[in-house]
From Swiss-Prot:
<dbReference type="InterPro" id="IPR000589">
    <property type="entry name" value="Ribosomal_uS15"/>
</dbReference>
<dbReference type="InterPro" id="IPR005290">
    <property type="entry name" value="Ribosomal_uS15_bac-type"/>
</dbReference>
<dbReference type="GO" id="GO:0005840">
    <property type="term" value="C:ribosome"/>
</dbReference>
<protein>
    <recommendedName>
        <fullName>Small ribosomal subunit protein uS15c</fullName>
    </recommendedName>
</protein>
<dbReference type="InterPro" id="IPR009068">
    <property type="entry name" value="uS15_NS1_RNA-bd_sf"/>
</dbReference>
<dbReference type="GO" id="GO:0006412">
    <property type="term" value="P:translation"/>
</dbReference>
<comment type="similarity">
    <text>Belongs to the universal ribosomal protein uS15 family.</text>
</comment>
<dbReference type="GO" id="GO:0009507">
    <property type="term" value="C:chloroplast"/>
</dbReference>
<keyword id="KW-0689">Ribosomal protein</keyword>
<keyword id="KW-0934">Plastid</keyword>
<dbReference type="GO" id="GO:0003735">
    <property type="term" value="F:structural constituent of ribosome"/>
</dbReference>
<keyword id="KW-0150">Chloroplast</keyword>
<dbReference type="GO" id="GO:1990904">
    <property type="term" value="C:ribonucleoprotein complex"/>
</dbReference>
<comment type="subunit">
    <text>Part of the 30S ribosomal subunit.</text>
</comment>
<dbReference type="Pfam" id="PF00312">
    <property type="entry name" value="Ribosomal_S15"/>
</dbReference>
<keyword id="KW-0687">Ribonucleoprotein</keyword>
Amino acid sequence: MVKNSPISVIPQEEKRGSVEFQVFNFTNKIERLTSHLELHRRDYLSQRGLRKILGKRQRLLVYLSKKNRVRYRELIGQLGIREPKTG
């Protein structure tokens, strides 16, 4: 599995507490858990953890889309995240 470096996705001056950095970290965790669950389909605790991380990332993305729509669109484009359905 190839990991994206935070430097290529997020500018150097961004802090670790920024919404973009947190979304990036959650995306890496989601990718790792997804590859783990492909091998271990019945690992229900990991499935639950994956759902929790997905929810956290979704809440952060909603927050970012309300605060700064341009940065939101750039981030989902760089990370390859689909835009959520509305309605």
